[in-house]
From Swiss-Prot:
It comes from Guillardia theta. GO terms for cellular component: chloroplast. This is Uncharacterized protein ycf20. It comes from the Eukaryota. It is found in: Plastid, Chloroplast. Belongs to the ycf20 family. Its main location: plastid. Keywords: Chloroplast, Plastid.
Amino acid sequence: MRLFFYNLLTILFGFFLSTLLSTILSQTGDWSILAASILVATIELINKNKYKKKPLIIGLVLTI
């Protein structure tokens, strides 16, 4: 049950953070492309580190 609340809080914080960043960075039109590319690169690096180890089912499918 504690893990459920932790995951829920993490999802809600992610929505809050994405709304906050998109609102702040879109105030000036000059930085929109640069800010978007930095955000995408950061998110991709986080995802690469998080999903470095493949789940068992994907490993089984790839060996077929």
